């Protein structure tokens, strides 16, 4: 496929995902405690749970999940530019943090959570809105009882690499206090 065909396919796939998703919203912390990480994403893709609002803020969305893998699609735009006229490194970092973190999340059991301990980002090529879409794919390297690692890449529709990252995530038991089950902050 040439680049225009890939872009057209990615746009079509994005629309199919958007048609199934609820409006982005913050999910109450305790709402997903009875689900595995993979079940959370299955519920998001089925329109039963909302996707996180960060994707709406930075114009990216989850496209596909399987255990140990998470794929996001982003639209780099002028609103993401830094003073040099290219996409800000924070946009790359947030997109890749989502991909690698969610790859880890897909492997978690009921009652488990995670947080990013470290994110190492390498931006290897400048990005502008001349590239209409990019994909970020996160893949798990290792999942243990307390620590997980994953790697990710951002590529354009022509297959060019724009950035890559690794993460270390802390895995923990979700607290189950009465205030959390009532929607509080715990």
What are these regions (language model features)?
Residues 1-186:
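Terminal targeting signals and extreme-terminal segments of soluble enzymes
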């Amino acid at each position: 496929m040439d680049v225009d065909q890939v872009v057209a396919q990615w746009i079509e796939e994005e629309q199919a995902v958007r048609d199934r998703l609820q409006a982005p919203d913050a999910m109450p912390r305790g709402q997903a405690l009875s689900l595995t990480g993979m079940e959370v994403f299955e519920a998001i893709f089925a329109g039963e749970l909302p996707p996180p609002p960060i994707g709406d803020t930075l114009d990216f969305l989850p496209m596909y999940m399987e255990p140990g893998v998470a794929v996001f699609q982003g639209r780099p735009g002028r609103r993401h530019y830094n003073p040099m006229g290219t996409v800000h490194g924070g946009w790359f970092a947030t997109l890749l943090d989502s991909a690698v973190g969610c790859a880890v999340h897909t492997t978690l059991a009921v009652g488990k959570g995670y947080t990013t301990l470290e994110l190492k980002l390498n931006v290897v090529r400048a990005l502008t809105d001349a590239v209409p879409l990019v994909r970020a794919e996160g893949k798990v390297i290792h999942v243990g009882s307390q620590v997980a690692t994953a790697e990710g890449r951002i590529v354009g529709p022509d297959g060019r690499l724009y950035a890559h990252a690794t993460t270390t995530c802390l895995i923990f038991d979700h607290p189950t206090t009465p205030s959390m089950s009532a929607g509080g902050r715990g």
